[in-house]
Every structure is written in structure tokens, then in C-alpha cells.
């Protein structure tokens, strides 16, 4: 269902100058919550941006009626520290410092340099590039340095 929602709202969000990072539908305390997270290629995602996007996509979602039950729409920034789960997440996080855990239990910190549909390239501290297929990644999360 979230894939259909993503397909419906992605073009609208891009027409406003922002990028759709993720869509998730969760249930918390018996309440359905549709979470839409954004990236602003020109800077931070402000509260005004979240409100603007929410006001535009809310009626669109109501008309499409993808979600049968009542739900709350939450629009937010993709966040400073987040887990990268899809090739799209990797592509939208290029240049960021990440912590990588591999399925073989190896782990390292690096800068995400490139990503495609099959693998991601990481620049290690010694500036060497390590290419890893997604199937070999256990967990990758962005790191925010204060």
C-alpha cells in the first residue's frame, strides 16, 4: 500500500522542489499514522515546508482512498540520523558519514560516495573505496557529528 501512496505523491512533492525520502504506515495506540519524510535539496526541511506538503497531499490522499481506516498524516524531515534501507535511501544520502555493519559481522565508519540499484560505495578513513552489495549489508545508518 505504501508503494501506491509513494507513487501518487512523489511527483507532487518534487514539483514543490523537495524529494520524497520515505513513506510508512504504522499503527500506534490503535491509531493509524501515515508518515511521509522529505529531503530538501536546498537545505533544511522547515516546519513551513512540512505544513505546505501536508496541505497539498492530504486532499490527494483522501480522494485516492488508499487507507480505509482513519489515519493521521505526519510530514517531517528525513532526520539527521536514520537507517538506510533502500537504494533510494542510499542515493539520497550521498556524501554523508555512515556506520556500516555487514552480514559477516565486519563494521566500519565511512562516507557514502556512490549508490546504484545493486550496491553502494563507501570511502574509508584511508580514502580507499569499498564497494558493498546491498545483500551483504546488515545495517547502515547515517551519523551526525556535533
From Swiss-Prot:
SUPFAM superfamilies: YhbC-like, N-terminal domain. The keyword Nucleotidyltransferase does not apply. It is found in: Cytoplasm. InterPro entries: Ribosome_maturation_RimP, RimP_C, RimP_N, RimP_N_sf. CDD domains: YlxS_C. It comes from the Bacteria. GO terms for biological process: ribosomal small subunit assembly; translation. One of its GO terms (cellular component) is cytosol. Its main location: cytoplasm. Keywords: Cytoplasm, Ribosome biogenesis. Gene3D superfamilies: RimP-like superfamily, N-terminal (3.30.300.70). The keyword Cytoplasm applies. Pfam families: DUF150_C, RimP_N. Belongs to the RimP family. Required for maturation of 30S ribosomal subunits. This is Ribosome maturation factor RimP. It comes from Helicobacter pylori (strain G27).
Amino acid at each position: 500500500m505504501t508503494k501506491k501512496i509513494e507513487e501518487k505523491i512523489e511527483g507532487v512533492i518534487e514539483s514543490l522542489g523537495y524529494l520524497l525520502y520515505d513513506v510508512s504506515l504504522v499503527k500506534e495506540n490503535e491509531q493509524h499514522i501515515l508518515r511521509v519524510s522529505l529531503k530538501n535539496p536546498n537545505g533544511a526541511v522547515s516546519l513551513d515546508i512540512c505544513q505546505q506538503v501536508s496541505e497539498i497531499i492530504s486532499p490527494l490522499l483522501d480522494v485516492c482512498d488508499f487507507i480505509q481506516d482513519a489515519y493521521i498524516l505526519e510530514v517531517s524531515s528525513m532526520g539527521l540520523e536514520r537507517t538506510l534501507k533502500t537504494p533510494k535511501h542510499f542515493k539520497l544520502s550521498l556524501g554523508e558519514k555512515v556506520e556500516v555493519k555487514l552480514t559477516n559481522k565486519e563494521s566500519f565508519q565511512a562516507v557514502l560516495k556512490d549508490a546504484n540499484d545493486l550496491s553502494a560505495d563507501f570511502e574509508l578513513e584511508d580514502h580507499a573505496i569499498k564497494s558493498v552489495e546491498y545483500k551483504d549489508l546488515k545495517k547502515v545508518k547515517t551519523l551526525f557529528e556535533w
